[in-house]
């Protein structure tokens, strides 16, 4: 995953739990990286290690860590880094979800080594929409659920 994901984990932890918790998470995960470069790809194992260590250090489930990261991704990372792209996705949530594949195509221009998940929509109705998620990466469903 790109460093922007690991940086989002760091920012989430630091802002909500403090720098000491972040240092404890880095130590527990055996990650020897002082800072993450947003545009650099990192081994997925680093991201998973950080999430697992956050679960242990914070005393919450891995699912709760990933839920919090999903919320953070939209409310903080998305707004700060991709506001223009997100606004171009549509005038409402339904339009954005329908246009999500186009959003990832645009993101891939910024992150050429990105392996994005695949989203498809079906059963589009006035008050509901079914979103189907597929990824080569295992275990990120809770992250996606809270986006």
What is each of the regions a protein language model found here?
Residues 3, 7, 15, 19, ...:
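Electropositive phosphate-/nucleotide-binding environments in soluble metabolic enzymes
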Residues 10-11, 39-40, 136-137:
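A generic structural signal for short
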Residues 6-7, 35-37, 131-134:
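A short, structure-level motif marking secondary-structure boundaries and short turns
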Residues 2, 19-22, 40, 44, ...:
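Alpha-helix N-cap/helix-initiation sites
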Residues 1-33:
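Charged, compositionally biased N-terminal leader segments and the immediate start
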Residues 20-22, 26-57:
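Long amphipathic alpha-helical segments
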Residues 47-137, 141:
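Amphipathic interaction/junction segments at domain boundaries or subunit interfaces
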Residues 143-147:
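Extended Gly/Ser/Thr-rich low-complexity repeat segments
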